[in-house]
């Protein structure tokens, strides 16, 4: 399993220290990243989770895959204005992050990773 569950502290070290710069996110990673915002009680999140895990294994070493539980990390969810779950945030090495709301299938997730991150 190549997915890492993020806390606020880990987010500030691996993704961005958003408390330093409120205007924009200065990405700290050495590889593009994708974050799945979810909740354990969310049916669509539970359906999407195995897809996310499979794709994370396929892109191991190329893209960092993270998960954030919105109930445990409300501040991180607010940072990306997460209003529905699952919400998937794609963070490329250069350029602005992109957000996709709702569960997507494996082909769509792989296409998004290839087009947005690689």
Regions found by a protein language model. Give the residues of each.
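Structural microenvironment flanking redox-active thiols in thiol-disulfide oxidoreductases
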Residues: 70-78
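Structural signal for short hydrophobic segments within the conserved structured cores
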Residues: 4, 66, 97-100
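Short pre-active-site segment immediately N-terminal to redox-active cysteine/selenocysteine motifs
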Residues: 30-33, 37-41, 84
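Non-catalytic, surface beta->alpha helical segment in thiol-disulfide oxidoreductase systems
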Residues: 84, 89-118
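Conserved redox-active cysteine motifs that mediate thiol-disulfide chemistry
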Residues: 37-51
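N-terminal targeting signals for export/organelle localization
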Residues: 1-12, 114, 118
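Conserved helix-turn-beta segment immediately C-terminal to the redox Cys motif
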Residues: 30-32, 49-68
